[in-house]
From Swiss-Prot:
It comes from Frankia casuarinae (strain DSM 45818 / CECT 9043 / HFP020203 / CcI3). Keywords: ATP-binding, Cytoplasm, Magnesium, Metal-binding, Nucleotide-binding, One-carbon metabolism, Potassium, Transferase. Pathway: Amino-acid biosynthesis; S-adenosyl-L-methionine biosynthesis; S-adenosyl-L-methionine from L-methionine: step 1/1. InterPro entries: ADOMET_SYNTHASE_CS, S-AdoMet_synt_C, S-AdoMet_synt_central, S-AdoMet_synt_N, S-AdoMet_synthetase, S-AdoMet_synthetase_sfam. Belongs to the AdoMet synthase family. GO terms for cellular component: cytoplasm. Gene3D superfamilies: 3.30.300.10. Its cofactor is Mg(2+); K(+). Its main location: cytoplasm. Binds 2 divalent ions per subunit. Binds 1 potassium ion per subunit. Homotetramer; dimer of dimers. This is S-adenosylmethionine synthase 2. Mg(2+) binds at residue 17.
Amino acid sequence: MATRLFTSESVTEGHPDKIADQISDSILDAMIKDDPKSRVAVETLITTGQVHVAGEVTTKTYVDIASVVRERILEIGYDSSKKGFDGASCGVSVSIGAQSPDIAQGVDTAHETRVEGSADDEFDRQGAGDQGLMFGFACDETPELMPLPIALAHRLARRLSAVRKEGQIGYLRPDGKTQVTIEYVDGKPARLDTVVVSSQHAADIDLDTLLAPDIAEYVVEPELALLEIATEGRRLLVNPTGRFEIGGPMGDAGLTGRKIIVDTYGGYARHGGGAFSGKDPSKVDRSAAYAMRWVAKNVVAAGLASRCEVQVAYAIGKAQPVGLFVETFGTGTVPDIQIQDAVTSVFDLRPAAIIRDLDLLRPVYAQTAAYGHFGRPELDFTWESTARAEALQRAVKG
């Protein structure tokens, strides 16, 4: 019997890096709402009393970026200097230029059209916005087909934020983190080993007599009651530093794209390195990573494997992927190459086809920017659909 421990973490919407992600995606949404063909690459830096927005944008619409920034920060809960940041009074600087024409030409007119003369198929006309490799993953550990450690970490982080906003624990502040360690036996989750919850709080809050009991009662225990694995003997660590009064952008500077493992699978699967937030779907860092989750989830939903990881790779300016790789870690019901061939026949992985099939030219991105882009049953994300599972089953049978 092989016993191992695996750990994943999540952060709340008030974590400085997540504030930056949400600002970048809120700006993206505002542009796509009025001009779905907007090309957007927006980065955000947030620090004590200041927000800096920079990047490259080509759009037909106008967005009051400073207003978008302030509204998002206030929605998160930073509305007073007593909390370390005030969205109403912070400084906002904006430095936005146009998308490079050298990049635009490869996206607007793909290699297949410019060089290979393939102009008949409209999906051959749009090239990938960059080179790169993207991974998607799914497994049968949870109903949403996500690894249990990251799924539980996200649930705890969402509940930590909810009890603050609903006033159940009114002295909490927006910044917070969760971490979950699961004991695996023979590759299957068997027992909850450790939960760590760190939350920013008001001054003069006693950790032992108030904060720790409240976190246990209102945040941790309701989620553990839903678990289908053993929880006896677990450890709960609340604010292990002893105090967390200074948080958010006052405690640490935040940057777009610094929580890519939280955004995906909690380290349980590989990552191509590209961040998501602030990028329109012509950037395959985002759209192809969503597509790979879609593919992997359908493979598992089809019963072809209990774990599936899919890699795709692109060359900038080229529509067709330059590589596809399927790995089921020995859990496949048929050979991996057979699943790979089925994926190729069922899914069109050219960027324009992904954008069409997943309906990505919509303002849906700000809601992805906290608590994970995948395995969100409370949200109706197109890349979480398993409607192609039956088509994969048929394709495998030939």
